Amino acid sequence: EASGFLLELVNEVLDMGKLESEEVILEERSFNFFELFKEIRMVIEKQAKERGIEIIVHKYNVVHENLIGSPLHVKRVVMNILTNAIKYNKDNGKIFIEVDETQEDDNRVIVRFRCEDTGIGMSESFQKKIYEPFAQEKAGARTVYGGTGLGMPITKSLVEKMGGTISFESEENAGTTFYIEIPFQIDHNKQCEEHEKKEIKEASIKGVNVLLAEDNELNMEI
């Protein structure tokens, strides 16, 4: 466990250093948001199950699923938030997720992600320093819950680097809700490809005559 923590700490310190020195390069590639969300959900549900925590997707309404952006960093941001929602939750607790989009114009959408947990929440004093490196709620918290104290600073930096925003509401002993908004370009080429495939599939059976042969008079009448 100690070696695992040390490796995680070293990796996150390096990541934080890259973000601060503007060395992190975002991808600009096509990806399917639904497939990405499905991958995240499979991993998170497995982690949650170990503590009897229920994942409830209240809403998923992303119409433009073929987007252009940095899926690797999107995945890391969402995974960080959901992992914390499990880590700081109560046994047999719940996590409520909502994902939807707002279309800004013909070429751009903003995807909104909301994560609400029934966990231990945060004190008002800790809320003011949640994005500070190595911040912890109280002495010994890292021993109890694990983590390096760099997850939230990295998450905030990545969200802002992608042109998005992150905010939260929290009440001690009552849970925390995080809100993330990230803009993406719509991948029109992929949308057109899927539309064309659908048209070809529909055209392939359009106007086809089907002969049904029955040896029973009642079936023939039906």
Range-by-range predicted roles:
Residues E1-L6:
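Short alpha-helical segment of the dimerization/phosphotransfer core of two-component systems
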Residues G17-E28:
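Helix-loop junction within the histidine kinase core
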Residues E39, K46, E50, H58, ...:
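Disordered, acidic interdomain junction associated with two-component signaling
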Residues M122-Q136:
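Short conserved segment of the HATPase_c
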Residues G146, L150-G151, T155:
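Short alpha-helical Gxxx[C/S/T] motif in the catalytic ATP-binding
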